[in-house]
Amino acid sequence: MTDTGSSDTNTDTTGTSKANTMWGGRFAAGPDAIMEAINASISFDQRMARQDIEGSRAHAAMLAATGIVESSDVDVIREGLLTVLSEIEGGTFQYSTALEDIHMNVEARLTEIIGTPAGRLHTARSRNDQVATDFKLWVRDQMDAAISGIEALQRALLGQAEAGADWVMPGFTHLQTAQPVTWGHHMMAYVEMLGRDASRFRDARTRMNESPLGAAALAGTSFPIDRDMTAEALGFDRPSANSLDAVADRDFALEFLSAASICAMHLSRFAEELVIWSSAQFRFVALSDRFSTGSSIMPQKKNPDAAELIRAKIGRIFGANVALMTVMKGLPLTYSKDMQEDKEQTFDAADNLMLALAAMEGMVRDMQANVPSLEAAASSGFSTATDLADWLVRELNMPFREAHHVTGSLVKLAEDKGCDLPDLALSDMHSVHGDITDGVFDVLGVHNSVASRTSYGGTSPVQVREQVARWRDILG
């Protein structure tokens, strides 16, 4: 969502000694300046201005349709709300901390524009269901944006996977060489992870798509409202079934943050790999100048700052998830002012997730694999030892545990000789097991190794290309 305001733009921070005109009927005096400062949320919840006005226009239309408010008044209200939105999007709207939040700032400005009819807008509505509606709409938009960002990154990874379906690289366990894999297979691992991330956002979106509007403060309303009408107008599947739950619920934000945290964790893992791979010690990839920076003192440096910043920003997303769970864990039903603290961390997490997705997509599209370095690394570290053990099982009918032991002895022999397994002479192998034939050398090359891994989901180029085609079909 486009940010419709910021904490340092068009905000009047002047205090007031008068009671708030929106709720001050039972108060003899206005809040202390410190109370006003701690109570105000307009510095951040102005980001929900579009959703607030969208919800108010839907509510107003329903008030007219049900005969609760005259249609002539509602027409003026709905047009006035568009004027307010135009001012906000044009940057001329003056926010006031004395009015606390986006809801009262919008209503106050609407009153200035159209007069008395504005006072009818809040009929059959509370700020409790209003803010829940606004926040749900905002989070829903962010879920859609996250899915789009994930799919863009997946497409970039598919391009790398397709180009490198045959490129051999080391696969790692414990960051030690394990078995040869293909570059394309490694890229497709992240496509799969991100696919689960997108599905989590979709699942959460489906679950949260119930409208709280009409729950009022907590108990519903005595006015003959049509909650189905407002739910449909706002793109919800249905109205929420329990008014207490509707205003108390922030599960939708928690599910967004949970899905964002898991997605962010995947991005951080890949960022860590890119930092390592782009180092002089690995030289697996070259990151583009567009996503790197230099040093103010060391002229030779090309630093993977985008990857490092992705890795760091992920902590803010994790922190937001924990922060909101901590806010919510001790709250009795229904609404407490604590819940005002649900937004800033969610806004920040959404911003950082979208930034991380975009930066990762750019890095992936631009990065160049160093194919000779990848293959050289894949060919070292006895990476085809498992292929040798499998060959002993197939060709000599050896139990796998015995094959494992024989292979381990051959690895030790090669290590003592300072060579890799393919460099051992057949006579060397006979010193460990006399039945080994020269056919063993067919499986010790890394290209033969990856080509043999044809099981579904395996690393063979054939499997990689099939998985790329499957995902291109999924993404459309």
Swiss-Prot record:
Gene3D superfamilies: Fumarase/aspartase (C-terminal domain), Fumarase/aspartase (Central domain), Fumarase/aspartase (N-terminal domain). SUPFAM superfamilies: L-aspartase-like. Its main location: cytoplasm. Residues 1-17 have a biased composition (Low complexity). GO terms for cellular component: cytosol. Keywords: Amino-acid biosynthesis, Arginine biosynthesis, Cytoplasm, Lyase. It is found in: Cytoplasm. Pfam families: ASL_C2, Lyase_1. Residues 1-22 are annotated as: Disordered. Pathway: Amino-acid biosynthesis; L-arginine biosynthesis; L-arginine from L-ornithine and carbamoyl phosphate: step 3/3. One of its GO terms (biological process) is arginine biosynthetic process via ornithine. HAMAP family: Arg_succ_lyase. Belongs to the lyase 1 family. Argininosuccinate lyase subfamily. This is Argininosuccinate lyase. It comes from Jannaschia sp. (strain CCS1).
